């Protein structure tokens, strides 16, 4: 990625990084600016990802993307909403494709690795023996 401080995207800021005026229109259409925001803003701060009522029941799970990262939200057995990377740690396969209720576990479709609703690996069939 180019050094964005040398581009028109940062013309809205003074040398102390204070906003001089509104952002240029390219801030809303530039892939470089989006990548910068994803890395420097969204990935480092609290980010809204959904509504609690969309995860009404224990085991409800919803796939989302934040800062170009695939995640999923799940309501745990303790009635807490948790967020996890949407990949199996075995072969990096996507765990959740669509909103659903997974009951009390999330199972990888590749080798059937099983995670509980707190993200802990519970079973790894055919692994290590």
Where are these regions (language model features)?
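Rieske [2Fe-2S] iron-sulfur-binding domain
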Residues: 55-129
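Generic detector of well-ordered alpha-helical segments enriched in charged/polar residues
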Residues: 10-11, 34-38, 111
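Glycine/alanine-rich phosphate-binding loops at beta-alpha junctions
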Residues: 27-67
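Non-cleavable N-terminal signal-anchor transmembrane helices
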Residues: 20-22, 26-27, 39, 94
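A short linear-motif detector with a strong N-terminal bias
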Residues: 6-7, 25-29, 41-43, 50-52, ...
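Short, contiguous pre-domain boundary segments
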Residues: 6-25
């Amino acid at each position: 990625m180019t050094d964005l401080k040398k581009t028109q995207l940062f013309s809205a800021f003074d040398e102390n990084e204070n906003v001089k005026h509104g952002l240029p229109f390219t801030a809303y259409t530039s892939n470089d600016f989006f990548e910068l925001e994803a890395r420097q803003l969204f990935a480092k701060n609290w980010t809204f990802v959904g509504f609690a009522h969309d995860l009404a029941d224990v085991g409800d799970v919803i796939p989302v993307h934040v800062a170009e990262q695939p995640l999923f939200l799940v309501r745990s057995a303790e009635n807490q909403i948790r967020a996890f990377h949407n990949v199996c740690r075995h072969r990096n396969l996507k765990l959740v494709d669509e909103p659903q209720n997974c009951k009390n576990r999330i199972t990888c479709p590749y080798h059937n690795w099983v995670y509980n609703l707190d993200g802990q690996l519970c079973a790894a069939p055919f692994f290590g023996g």
